[in-house]
Regions:
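Hydrophobic alpha-helical segments at protein termini of multi-pass membrane proteins
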Residues: 2-146
Length: 146
């Protein structure tokens, strides 16, 4: 019986499709439950003011452009530092998908289920970083074996 090759990263196409859906979901949740106040955050306000954006859904292309730059820079660093020659960009994109999925799940739990264990999204940042690093290390180990 032939052993199938294990995929540890998403393809670029699927990663981008999922990221687009997650960004639109995040923006939609902000519009529905917070009336667009997410654009008033310290990070997004200067960007929104620069482009004159008042609706979070209209910020989607800017966020996706930012993700594109992060994916390219992260893939370049993975190739240079970690010596991952294949699937470096897919690794970064999959990490973004996992981290953003956890963030969106937290948003859904806060808005729909009144989840208050983590009262502020800033407290979630270290947790998301740990999740991203843990997946990155695991996937990198698997990719180097392949």
């Amino acid at each position: 019986m032939k052993k199938e090759k294990q995929r540890v990263v998403l393809s670029r196409l699927w990663a981008w499709i999922i990221l687009v859906l997650l960004v639109v979901l995040d923006a939609s949740l902000d519009v529905i439950f917070e009336q667009g106040r997410g654009l008033e955050s310290n990070i997004l306000k200067p960007i929104a003011d620069l482009f004159g954006i008042t609706n979070p859904i209209l910020m989607t292309p800017v966020v996706l452009l930012l993700f594109y730059l992060v994916a390219k820079a992260g893939a370049w660093m993975a190739k240079k530092i970690d010596k991952i020659s294949e699937q470096a960009e897919e690794l970064v994109l999959t990490t973004l998908v996992i981290v953003y999925s956890v963030f969106d799940l937290w948003l859904i739990s806060v808005y729909l289920l009144d989840f208050t264990l983590i009262p502020n999204h800033l407290y979630l940042i270290p947790i998301l970083i740990v999740i991203g690093i843990a997946y990155g290390w695991w996937a990198e180990k698997k990719l180097i074996k392949i």
